[in-house]
Structure formats: C-alpha cells, structure tokens
Amino acid sequence: MKLIWSEESWDDYLYWQETDKRIVKKINELIKDTRRTPFEGKGKPEPLKHNLSGFWSRRITEEHRLVYAVTDDSLLIAACRYHY
C-alpha cells in the first residue's frame, strides 16, 4: 500500500520530529497498523462524518488524531496533529 502525505500532514509530522519523538513513534505504529488493517486495530479507528466523510481517524494522544483515507492501493495521511 502506497503512503501519501498531504502537505499539512507532512508539516505536522516534521513538527513532531522536532518536538516529541514519542509521538513520532506512535504515528509510525498507527500507520503500520493502518496499512495492515485500515478499519480496525490500534488507536480506536472511527469513520468521520459530514465534510470529512470517507476519512477515518485514530487516536495518537487524547488531544491529537491521525486522519487518513484509504483507496485500493494507497493510504492518504490528511493530518497527524490536533483534532479534525
């Protein structure tokens, strides 16, 4: 499964690399798990609604979420900082 980062999510990821390596590790674990089982597993995956319909979220921390969408052959990371 191909991994695609939005510009915003990549900026979020770079922010975490500079400020909190534990969160980077957690994001990497969630991405690995999401690639295997996109709609179940770690981080309490849940489908998003309304203007984010088609996207899913997983908990990174109580405050931050990994927001993503899955297609047949790719995983789009939309955000990995703050709530949706």
Swiss-Prot record:
Protein family according to the UniProt entry: Belongs to the YoeB family.
Function: Toxic component of a type II toxin-antitoxin (TA) system. Its mode of function is controversial; it has been proposed to be an mRNA interferase but also an inhibitor of translation initiation. When overproduced in wild-type cells, inhibits bacterial growth and translation by cleavage of mRNA molecules while it has a weak effect on colony forming ability. Overproduction of Lon protease specifically activates YoeB-dependent mRNA cleavage, leading to lethality. YefM binds to the promoter region of the yefM-yeoB operon to repress transcription, YeoB acts as a corepressor.
Organism: Escherichia coli (strain K12)
Cited InterPro entries: RelE/ParE_toxin_dom_sf, YoeB_toxin
SUPFAM superfamilies: RelE-like
PANTHER family with a match to the protein in the record: TOXIN YOEB
Gene ablation phenotype (knockout): No visible phenotype under standard growth conditions. Delays Lon protease-dependent lethality upon overexpression of Lon, but does not fully suppress it. No loss of ability to form persister cells.
Keyword Electron transport belongs to the record: no
Molecular functions (GO terms): endonuclease activity; protein homodimerization activity; ribosomal small subunit binding; RNA binding; RNA endonuclease activity; RNA endonuclease activity, producing 3'-phosphomonoesters
Enzyme Commission number: 3.1.-.-
Keywords on record: Endonuclease, Hydrolase, Nuclease, Repressor, RNA-binding, Toxin-antitoxin system, Transcription, Transcription regulation
Name of the protein in its database record: Toxin YoeB
Induction: Repressed by YefM, more strongly repressed by the YefM(2)YoeB heterotrimer. Induced in persister cells. Ectopic expression of Salmonella or Shigella toxin VapC induces the yefM-yoeB operon and also induces Yoeb toxin activity in a Lon protease-dependent manner.
